[in-house]
Amino acid sequence: MLTEDSISHLHGVERPLFVMDQWMYHSRMYAAASYARTRDDLDVIQLNSFGCGLDAVTTDEVSDILTNSGKIYTCLKIDEVNNLGAARIRIRSLISALRVRERKQECRTVESTAYERVVFTEEMRKDYTILCPQMSPIHFDVIEPAFRSCGYHIDVLPDSDRAAIDMGLKYVNNDACYPSLVVVGQIMTAVLSGKYDPDKLAVIITQTGGGCRATNYISFIRRALAKAGHANIPVVSLNLTGLESNPGFKITPGLAFKGLYGLVFGDIFMRVLYRMRPYEKEPGSADRLHQKWLKICQDFVSQKHVSHRRFVQICKGIIEDFDKLPIYEDMKKPRVGVVGEILVKYSPSANNHLVELLESEGAEAVVPELMDFLLYCFKNSEFKADHLGKKRSSARTARLGIIAMEWLRKPAVKALKKSVHFGTPGNIDEMAEQATDCLLYTSPSPRDSTSGRI
């Protein structure tokens, strides 16, 4: 009986892998599996204690490394029951299968573990449809035309239904977290619908670069496409960290500005619509006002060249128009915050239409701005530079990102401050400072070498 760290140094891993290889224990597992696949006298049993979506990522990869070279993969979920009866049965089954193979003297071929991804080229950009999974309809309704105006044939998929969730369960390891099933289910439903030519199709997905399974959405999607016989479909990584590059997709200044304008518009709509709709005197009036301004915003981001002055005017116009919407001023309803994992927080289907449910039950829903998530990502880079030894250059870039985003939404914040009914989003630096009283202290910071506070 050998542990993974006793043999992982004996064989390197042929890269790139399907997954983002960024965790030391899992890297040793991949190396150990790569070595085991080259030998007939060595087999692997992976012990797995379910924690989150990362377990699905790593067990899938170890399975691929072994099974693609004709080896048997066995995974024991050690947290399922208190007794080991089930584990004993699995191990006995493995031993029995190995003996059968030995008697039959089956031959196998050792295959490379490297994955050759399909690159999205400049030629593909001209006539390929790019599928984008839905996350937040109130934002993506504006962001989609922004991408199209920059020459990308983007199709934002409809919000998931039960069929899409079932499709996700079919093509994704069922130990993966729910958002992974939702995203992959949307994409595979569209790919297999017959609506699109699979030879003229690409998929785009964000890739955060963090330790969460969100960095590995892209591997879930590629694995699902390969299972369905569509490994030829390129999957484009939308990231700001240089994880993957595609010649046919580039974040130009024009695309970045239009996308961020759309993000600000979506945040404004979310704040003013959710604030006024529960109190409207005329049912449906808030939604009609939303549709009116949505069309204006879509037309704005669809222009070849956008004016920041016009952006400021639209932000001010939306807020002032909603501020004048007739509502029951004397009515007070409980305000309920909606927080949590990013997709479940913003996607109506993923959260079982929670905002609608709250409003129907006599409450007012409050959902944080999507831009706050991007600000958090930048702030996190500063934290890593202060406490975890990351490059100071990344912290300086992150600070510039925070300054740019706060400047972009400054017109909205200014108009919200002047309004009667609306509050303003919080400042990321102030929130981080306040959080130091709630969170565990880290190692001492350069800014405060005695307390360990940021």
Question: What residues fall within each predicted segment?
Answer:
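An N-terminal assembly and electron-transfer interface module characteristic of large anaerobic redox
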Residues: 1-443, 447, 454
